[in-house]
Amino acid sequence: GSVVASYPYDDSPTHRLTGVYSKSADDEVFKYLAKAYASHHPIMRTGKPNCPGEEAETFPDGITNGAQWYDVEGGMQDYNYVWANCFEITLELSCCKYPPTSELPKEWENNRESLLAFIEKV
């Protein structure tokens, strides 16, 4: 996990593991939506999730193009965009995939304003 808003494409023509910006035709719209979420999140907006073992990982403005972060061939985000015209972003909300129940109220507070801002945009 991490704390970042990721947008298409997750796959790239070269299928390199990381570092390839795979721009969609709607790249500016996706960046706008990802920033709408990230800019209201207290951790995501810093671009420094500081996840254990990945402390050096950073995301400018708290967002990333999926394939630039890591290549995912055949992912749902790309499939939905290409085949269903669904503008989908992926939200990584925690360094921990399954945070303990005791942390859920804090996670809600971290994400509430982001979620409302995102809903207003879409």
Per-segment meaning from a language model:
Residues 1-122:
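Metallocarboxypeptidase
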